[in-house]
Amino acid sequence: MVEIPVSLGELIDKITILFIKRKYINDFDKLRNVNQEYDLLITKWKSLKEYSEESLGHLVTSLANVNERIWFVEDAIRDHERRQDFGEDFIKLARSVYTLNDERANIKRQINLRLGSQIYEEKSYAKYKD
């Protein structure tokens, strides 16, 4: 295992994604790996001086909700791909991925600001709305 520095928002994001995987993955071997990673990251998070469930409650919940929506959108896109159905619904789903990811990045930034993270993830995409 290698340890790398990441922003606090990125750590919490990863934990929320692993939590979602724990809910929806049924394959025993995959679930064992997910649980192992989840346990390692939760332990790391709780050991940090910045750890505080109280100050982040609504942000963590919002991040988990966005990540779960992304999970369902990605599943729906794959269903359309399997059926070779690239109509209006497929386009709407595909377009929602970047708006959801923008929302996700915003919440991660709020977490980083709230906790005074030393690392901040930066995004740089062309504006698509005013």
Explain the meaning of each model-derived region.
Residues 1-130:
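Extended, charge-rich alpha-helical interface modules
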